[in-house]
Swiss-Prot record:
It comes from Xanthomonas oryzae pv. oryzae (strain PXO99A). This is Large ribosomal subunit protein bL17. Pfam families: Ribosomal_L17. GO terms for cellular component: cytosolic large ribosomal subunit. InterPro entries: Ribosomal_bL17, Ribosomal_bL17_CS, Ribosomal_bL17_sf.
Length: 127
């Protein structure tokens, strides 16, 4: 029986799943907006939000903890220098998931995942 087993499998091995969400979280922190399938977006929330909470308190131990989970120096640097201070007063809810219709090839539900309170660039508004 599958009682108390939280999280989606996505038809991948645990190592593949872990690497996928590690890469997605790093991309989210770098670009602050990514497009993915809706189930992956909902599962990414469980990975990215605790990392932002860790990024709110800068220190060697927290940086090492974040690097152990992300394995991306650039993303960890931005997490502590830019994102942590930005969300210092926010007690959670750092991500916004916006539904974006269905993918043309397989009709999978798509979604945008973005960081709340991200600076909007003028050229993005023009789109």
């Amino acid at each position: 029986m599958r009682h108390q087993k939280s999280g989606r499998k996505f038809n991948r091995t645990s190592a593949h799943r872990e690497a996928m969400f590690r890469n997605m979280a790093a991309s989210l922190f770098k670009h602050e907006l990514i497009k993915t399938t809706l189930p992956k977006a909902k599962e990414l929330r469980r990975v990215a939000e605790p990392l932002i909470t860790i990024g709110k308190v800068d220190g060697v131990a927290n940086r090492r903890l974040a690097f152990a989970r992300l394995r991306d120096k650039e993303a960890v640097g931005k997490l502590f220098v830019e994102l942590g201070p930005r969300y210092a007063t926010r007690p959670g809810g750092y991500l916004r998931i916006l539904k974006a219709g269905f993918r043309a090839g397989d009709n999978a539900p798509m979604a945008y995942v973005e960081l709340v309170d991200r600076p909007v660039v003028a050229e993005e508004v023009a789109e």
